[in-house]
Every structure is written in structure tokens, then in C-alpha cells.
UniProtKB/Swiss-Prot annotation:
This is 6,7-dimethyl-8-ribityllumazine synthase. GO terms for biological process: riboflavin biosynthetic process. Its EC number is 2.5.1.78. It comes from the Bacteria. The gene is ribH. SUPFAM superfamilies: Lumazine synthase. The lineage of its organism: Bacteria, Pseudomonadati, Pseudomonadota, Alphaproteobacteria, Hyphomicrobiales.
Length: 162
């Protein structure tokens, strides 16, 4: 049997010249600051150029990303990847499920429709304490993790299946 498995590009390999869009929901501003710091550090360390746009919350992230992607294409300055950052903390109503599910679905639809490398750093947690455990730079920052996921996909896309 012939194997068609392709190994991904090495983590940490530079992505010089990659233009990456971060879309951050700022409903929880202090958490957003931490997630952004982690994502920006990971992207800049890899040699990517970073643009940031902000929206009120997680539910607005997918459409904001779509609008920005279209505008960048029209200006002939396309983005190679998107990193979504935000936080949804469960409350007493069904709103959590709607925001968490629909923001994730919207991002996945966007990524698949455009073959777009995307890192989803929208935290979906039960408590604010859980959010902080996942947001603090130096303590498992999921913003940096989402950026690394997007970078991994950029490397894979650049490499293709050669």
C-alpha cells in the first residue's frame, strides 16, 4: 500500500510576509487585551504582518472577518490567515449556547468557503476564573495558541501537497 501522508511544515518556521488579520471581540476588555498580546507576539515572532480590528463581542467576529477579507481582496492586499479572539462566559440564560455555537459555526463556514487558515481563540468557559486561566500571557494563553494554529495552516497552505 502506498502512503499519501504529507508532513506539515515545522512549527516555528518563519512565515515572512504573511498578512494576518486578528479580529477581537472586546466584550471582556481585560481578557481581550491578554489574548491579543499573546496572539500578536506569536505572529510577530514568526515574521507575520498583523492587522487588528475590534468588534463588540464574539458573535460579530465572523461577519467582521468576512467584510475585512473582501475589502483586502478588493485592494489586492489579501490576508493569508485570520485569528479570532474573544470570550464567552456562561450565564443564566441560553444566550451562551447561541453565541458560542454560532460564532464557531460562522468561523468554520468562513474558513471552509475561502480555504482560509484560521485560528479560533474565542474562549467558551463556565467562569471568569477559567477565562483568566486560558488568557494570561505566560500561562497557556489561548490567543497565542490560536495564532500558532493559524500559522501552522499558513505553512501547510504555502507548502501545498508537494
Amino acid at each position: 500500500m502506498v502512503s499519501t501522508r504529507k508532513e506539515g511544515a515545522s512549527a516555528g518556521e518563519p512565515v515572512t510576509g504573511a498578512r494576518v488579520l486578528i479580529v477581537e471581540g472586546r466584550y471582556y476588555e481585560a481578557l481581550a487585551d491578554e489574548l491579543l498580546a499573546g496572539a500578536r507576539a506569536a505572529l510577530e515572532a514568526a515574521g507575520a504582518t498583523v492587522d487588528v480590528i475590534t468588534v463588540p463581542g464574539a458573535l460579530e467576529i465572523p461577519i467582521a472577518a468576512e467584510i475585512a477579507l473582501e475589502a483586502a481582496e478588493e485592494e489586492d492586499e489579501p490576508y493569508e490567515a485570520v485569528v479570532a479572539l474573544g470570550c464567552v462566559i456562561r450565564g443564566e440564560t441560553y444566550h451562551f449556547e447561541i453565541v458560542a455555537g454560532e460564532s464557531s459555526r460562522g468561523l468554520m463556514d468562513l474558513a471552509l468557503a475561502h480555504a482560509l487558515p484560521l485560528g479560533n481563540g474565542i474562549l467558551t468557559v463556565e467562569t471568569e476564573a477559567q477565562a483568566w486561566e486560558r488568557a494570561r500571557v505566560g500561562e497557556g494563553n489561548k490567543g497565542g495558541g490560536a495564532a500558532e494554529a493559524a500559522l501552522s495552516l499558513v505553512r501547510l497552505k504555502r507548502r501545498g501537497l508537494k
